[in-house]
Each structure stands twice: as C-alpha cells, then as structure tokens.
Regions:
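Rhodanese-like catalytic fold shared by cysteine-dependent sulfurtransferases
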Residues: 1-19, 26-57, 66-99
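Short, surface-exposed ligand- or partner-binding patches at beta-edge/loop junctions that are enriched
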Residues: 61
C-alpha cells in the first residue's frame, strides 16, 4: 500500500492521520501549502529525522513530485517504512478535501 501513487490509497493514509511533510523550500511553503503540513525541505530532511522518527505514516509532497520522490527514498533509507509520495501540493490538497 505505501509508496503507491494511487490517490485512493493516499486518501486512506491521510484519513488515518498521516504526517504531511512539504519538502519544498521555506519560501515556497510560505506562499501556501496543505492544511496541517509541516515544512522540512528535502535538502535538510536527513538532518531533521529526529523530528519525525516516531511517526508511523508519512506523506511527502512538493511542487512537481520530484523532490518528494527523493524525500521518500531518503526516509526509506533511514528506516521509515510507511512513506507515501503524495507528489504535488495540489494533489494532496485534493485528496485532503475528498477525505
């Protein structure tokens, strides 16, 4: 289930209280994000692992899906198992509204 790009699965993860992480830059995040999301830029995600180490389900997203794919890979390499690439901010927002 985790890691699939299917929006139904993404909606289920969000419904079950996943941590939403916007991996864009702080300035992009300041211009608007997803309600309830935290900002951890992809280039500093490894340094901030301790902030999220106790989270079971995580959704990462960005502007195009490229940085979130990288963030997902980094988190998985650091032992996280339930990481979903939500791809874009707009995609996650759409799924959040539909939950």
């Amino acid at each position: 289930m985790f890691g699939a790009s299917n929006n139904e699965e993404l909606k289920n993860v969000i419904k079950n209280g996943a941590l939403l992480i916007d991996v864009r830059t702080p300035s992009e995040f300041a211009d608007g994000s997803v309600k309830g999301a935290i900002n951890i830029p992809v280039d500093s995600i490894e340094k901030q692992i301790n902030k999220i180490k106790n989270k079971n389900n995580i959704v990462v997203f960005c502007r195009s899906g490229a940085r979130s794919a990288l963030a997902k890979r980094i988190l998985e390499q650091n032992g996280f198992k339930n990481v979903v690439n939500g791809k874009t901010k707009n995609n996650v927002n759409t799924c959040l509204v539909e939950v």
